[in-house]
Regions:
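A polyanion-binding, active-site-adjacent surface
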Residues: 2-104
Length: 104
């Protein structure tokens, strides 16, 4: 637990995640259920970065919770790691409609 947590102050990553959750800087916010900022320790030595959230991630607001998440959990387990040991996020924080490829 960092000093910030002990005194109730948010870390820079927590502040960024709060901004992402209410972001309306592109059109994707109109079709999302929840933004998916990422999760895990900000000082994690291992980071997984996907392309964009899928339907399950959009519903739960968490990265890699669908089929890809199950596979990731199995892979992490095989090397004696857990989700809490790594940082997981996506390039896009909102699901593109109908899982289409992201546009610039």
């Amino acid at each position: 637990m960092g000093v910030e947590k002990m005194y109730g102050e948010k870390t820079e990553l927590e502040k960024l995640h709060a901004k992402i959750r209410v972001c309306k800087k592109c059109e994707l916010w109109k079709t999302r259920t929840r933004a998916v900022p990422g999760e895990g320790p900000e000082n994690a030595k291992i980071r997984f970065i996907g392309l964009s959230p899928g339907a399950n991630e959009d519903l739960q607001g968490r990265p890699f919770v669908g089929r890809a998440g199950k596979l990731l959990d199995e892979l992490l387990n095989s090397i004696k790691l857990r989700r809490k040991d790594v940082f997981i996020t996506s390039v896009l924080k909102c699901r593109p409609p109908h899982n289409r490829m992201p546009k610039a």
